[in-house]
Amino acid sequence: MKAELVPVCTAWILGLLLCLGPAAAKVCGPNMDIRNDVSELKQLRDCVVIEGYLQILLISNAKAEDFRNLRFPNLTVITDYLLLFRVSGLVSLSNLFPNLTVIRGRVLFYNYALVIFEMTDLKEIGLYNLRNITRGAVRIEKNSELCYVSTVDWSLVLDAVYNNYIVGNKPPKECVDLCPGAREKMQICEKSSINNEFADRCWSDEHCQKVCPSVCGKRACSDNNECCHPECLGSCTAPDNDTACVACHHYFYEGRCVPTCPSNTYKFEGWRCITREVCAKMHIWIHSTIPFIIHKGECVYECPSGYMLNKSQSMTCSPCEGPCPKICEEKMKTIDSVTSAQMLEGCTVLKGNLQLNIRKGQNIAAELENFLGLIETVTGYVKIRHSHALVSLSFLKSLRYILGEEQMPGNYSFYVFDNNNLQQLWDWSKHNLTIKEGKIRFAFNSKLCASEIYRMEEVTGTKGRQAEEDISLSTNGNMASCESHVLNFTSRSKIKNRIKLTWERYRPPDYRDLISFTVYYKEAPFRNVTEYDGQDACGSNSWNMVDVDLPASKESDPGILLQGLKPWTQYAIYVKAITLTMLENRHIHGAKSKIIYMRTDAAVPSIPQDMISASNSSSQLVVKWNPPSLPNGNLSYYIVRWQQQPQDRHLYQYNYCFKDKVPNRKYANGTIDTEGGTEPTKPEGSVGEKGHYCACPKTEAEEKAEKDEAEYRKVFENFLHNSIFVPRPNRRRRDVLAVGNSTVTSYEKNSTTEDFSNFSDSERDDIEYPFYETKVDYKWERTVISNLQPFTLYRIDIHSCNHEAEKLGCSASNFVFARTMPAAGADDIPGIVNTKEEDDGVIFLGWPEPLRPNGLILMYEIEYKHQGEVHRECVSRQDYRKNGGIKLVRLPPGNYSAQVQAISLYGNGSWTEMVSFCVKLKPDVRNNILQMVVAIPLALSFLLVGIISIVCFVFKKRNSNRLGNGVLYASVNPEYFSAAEMYVPDKWEVPREKITMNRELGQGSFGMVYEGIAKGVVKDEAETKVAIKTVNEAASMRERIEFLNEASVMKEFNCHHVVRLLGVVSQGQPTLVIMELMTRGDLKSYLRSLRPDTESNSGQPTPSLKKMIQMAGEIADGMSYLNANKFVHRDLAARNCMVTEDFTVKIGDFGMTRDIYETDYYRKGGKGLLPVRWMSPESLKDGVFTTNSDVWSFGVVLWEIATLAEQPYQGMSNEQVLRFVMEGGLLEKPDNCPDMLFELMRMCWQFNPKMRPSFLEIISSIKDELDPGFKEVSFFYSEENKPPDTEELDLEAENMESIPLDPSCALQNSEHHAGHKSENGPGVVVLRASFDERQPYAHMNGGRKNERALPLPQSSAC
């Protein structure tokens, strides 16, 4: 009760506190930063709403008990984000914030509203009342002990989950993750589907995740599942009450949630309404002298862009005439990122100096223009330095004046230095700039030609102010296309990874102006590079540069030896002369060469990468690897070498007869691509886990996620640097594995291993096994190593070799260890167990060892029996090596049997055959025993004869009773039948002239079925399309009557989801039965028509999960109607369900499909046809048919729907299916089958019939997914629906064809039916008891007292 009052109190307190104002300190803010000590958490005491973010971080050396007494139940809302980082000792948030309900995410931490990062002790999140994160995503990362992450359905908390990033936490396989009730197998928590996994949703083993009823839609709900008021967010304490909300969807005002703020109040911080007086005091809370202002109904910190503060009314904003003159005072504003530029957004006058230092950035020009594009005047100077990301200054599109009130040393007002990519200042035909005071200075702007600078002199009015050295002609434009002479290479050669070049000596007009040369080179896989490639606006420069001094002799050509190049790599190279000569146009007059391409020599490749190995069988290992990162040539082949490893001799130090467990038993099951027919298989003769061997390439989404992760980590580290202390130092990279330094210079092709050594050799720890090797072509990157020993560890080395391997050798090796799979029968003891009597009551058992076991033999287990008692003994490996067996001592006299099994490193071998031995008696006792041995068998013989006599008498008596009461005798007049069997016309009779037959639909049980038109058979319909069933002309009178009697039973059906009988034409020939027309045929044919790869495809899409559930509900509704009326169907399958024009599925007419799908039936023991693939285990075994067995068949129908009518148990014969089902086998989950549908199937396939749900329970579990129209027509929602009884009628029979076909016969004595035979296959059975209401129950051999059977349709196949 106390817990239920918390939200009520919270909502009431929240309204009270907001009325009282900030003094009550219940609305905490603007931000809460908790760090360094647990005691700092006391700042949160009494907080109901945190207006801003909550950060709890960097609390080290804390223990779990430090948090036990800390509890903040009042906190319900955080308006920004929640961040937890490196807080030790905190195990769960459930006690800390039990009522935190909403995180609004108004301000996000790098797109995330909830960040849990590197919380080393956190075991569960535990925010069990968190219902809504309004904006932002979730990032939960690197929490090594965190479980209960996959049990939370974040789609119930967030509107979109695709931006969530949850990685690096405790592996799910190591987490228990049991929701409340799971241990007791009780359904307490709601279920939902995430990534095709339909499971319970919870925050911990004590708290379920709250799921509101579907009727609430997007509205919140209370803890009692009552729908809240539409203005409530998260939760509420009373339904449809806007004063009982825990949080508000829009705004909070005076204890009530409102869609918008009332008049004379103003929106504040996106969640509450305050008065003008409160807004005026807000600056006190922010610790600032600048008051808040009111604009467009909101209390805001400053006027937005396009508005300025109204001087007459200090708390309001007024629009500007043109651009707002927004003056920003900054002594020195340095722009080094988009974030820093954002601080000047909207500024038109910068009162101070502007410095640009933009080294990197993507789409940087657009971002800078957005934030700096309104600046018109800079009162000081402008300095642009090291801004490699800038190509132009056009983003300062409004800059008109640089006043130069403050200047740099040297009296510079415009200073441009070392901007590698700057090529343009402004478009001077459209831009005008005036520099009132000071000079300009340009240096080391390699792509900015002098003409651009001289143009700026003229426009800005600074021409003549600066000296010539202020505009360096040698460093500005030196990498632009200002040269005029082409240098030619005179020689070029290569030696391994070095390139030697010489070129002609350039002779400028004045030789003194030639300073030096610069050689540019870069890797160039393709011959399509240009001089400016790689020098983009992101600041990168992919060209390597080397300065070359002039040679001492004027006659010598300059040259260079480029060293340290990558082997077998093509390089692009060009050389440029550095001069001081100027022409009349004041451009630099220099020289450069054309780009040439050269490839270095090959070298030894690096090692292969990413080696993995998996066992393919007991004698094979599959090895896969990736190419070397540096092939250093054309990769040619790989050398694969392998070596058997000796067994671990330390394993023999233990006596495993006294150990709780044997060593870990694992073989290689790595991830291997299954191409090439080398897919790993299960252990021979055993059932193993299904491995996954597909290494999928990364998708674009995965690559983007990795990029985002790296970017997030960078931002997060920057946050730590700016907010906490210093970033973590770079970690040293750890070698994944060590490899040898030697290279392989030769190889011997050998893909198999030598003859195996005997087992005794394998037990030696000093043996060194030889290496074997084979050569694999470079295209394959995988191989299969064969002829290996079972369950044995191997080392596998791989060397990569390129086209120069004969000269240079191959790479060092990369290696991996892998164990082969166990071999079936390898641990079996060969031969027999030998026995030897050594003394009175002492028997020695000896046996040979397995020849090549799966690893080491650890022990032997002996089982011997005496007089029904089983005894076990254990022999350790050490004892066996000493004695060769075991002595059984103090054995009482008598006959014994014994068997032995070996236990290896892998597991248990098979038991040997039983060996019998006798422990003899002492001589003085043998005579007495001999008398007993003779007497006892004689007595038993007499007893056995008496029992047999009694059994024979009883059996004979019982048969005589049956002969008189149940056997049908051949009639003298076979044409005679009882008058009770005659069909009597009734109100269902339809005049023949009202029936018109149009076209054939197919062959039915008794004859052809037609489509036709009937007049007046349906109320308020003049004509109705119908299905017309007929009887063959050659049918006998009995067959015609049975045909009509079957129709008579259908008269009792009145359910929307059961095919209806509309009328009967019994007068004249042929006899007709008028049925409801199912235009789309049977469900099986309909489902197959939806297969996209079939010729008969109807063009309709494959059914969605909702459509499948709709079909299931309609079939279950029809079956629940039959169940309520004591009918057992016995042949529920897709072929016996029909589909209407509007795609409604109904239980069929119980006989029309038998001939069409004869292959779906199986004749057991030469008797009637049985649908074994749809039958339950109890029906197959004992011939028992109940509603529970119909539920089993319903599960198979669901499987048919999911597979579009594939045959169940495909690949098995009918006999195999019969054994498989009776032994507990189930159908596998179909491909792409939704978890919800498969879960429904599994419930129907419970082996215990009583554990299966009823049809009403099935509908109840899926009713929320069904169409609204289902309520109007279904039996489930009708007044007739009553809960089914569960008591069964005890009926027994073997053959389905023995059920009486004539309903009138059932009204006579039941003994007549006991012997009645029919050729019909399975159908529907009606069981009705006049004296009570019991669960429908039927048996193949017919019924008993007070029952009535539905006549089964005849089948020519029977």
Swiss-Prot record:
Family statement drawn from the similarity comment of this UniProt entry: Belongs to the protein kinase superfamily. Tyr protein kinase family. Insulin receptor subfamily.
SMART domains: FN3, FU, TyrKc
Cytoplasmic side: 956-1358
Record text on subunit structure and interactions: Tetramer of 2 alpha and 2 beta chains linked by disulfide bonds. The alpha chains contribute to the formation of the ligand-binding domain, while the beta chain carries the kinase domain.
Parts of the chain on the Extracellular side: 735-934
Active site (catalytic residues): D1131
Residues making up the signal peptide according to the UniProt record: 1-25
Assigned GO CC terms: axon; insulin receptor complex; plasma membrane
Cysteine disulfide links: C28-C47, C147-C175, C179-C202, C189-C208, C212-C221, C216-C227, C228-C236, C232-C245, C248-C257, C261-C273, C279-C299, C303-C317, C320-C324, C328-C347, C449-C482
Compartments, as annotated in UniProt: Cell membrane
Glycosylated residues (UniProt): 74, 99, 132, 241, 310, 411, 432, 488, 528, 616, 634, 669, 741, 750, 758, 895, 908
Descriptive protein name: Insulin-like growth factor 1 receptor
Transmembrane feature ranges: 935-955
Protein role: This receptor binds insulin-like growth factor 1 (IGF1) with a high affinity and IGF2 with a lower affinity. It has a tyrosine-protein kinase activity, which is necessary for the activation of the IGF1-stimulated downstream signaling cascade. Plays a role in oocyte maturation. Promotes head development by inhibiting Wnt signaling during embryogenesis.
GO terms classed as biological process: cellular response to glucose stimulus; insulin receptor signaling pathway; insulin-like growth factor receptor signaling pathway; oocyte maturation; positive regulation of MAPK cascade; positive regulation of phosphatidylinositol 3-kinase/protein kinase B signal transduction; protein autophosphorylation; regulation of JNK cascade
Protein residues bound to ATP: L1001, G1002, Q1003, G1004, S1005, F1006, G1007, M1008, V1009, K1029
Gene: igf1r
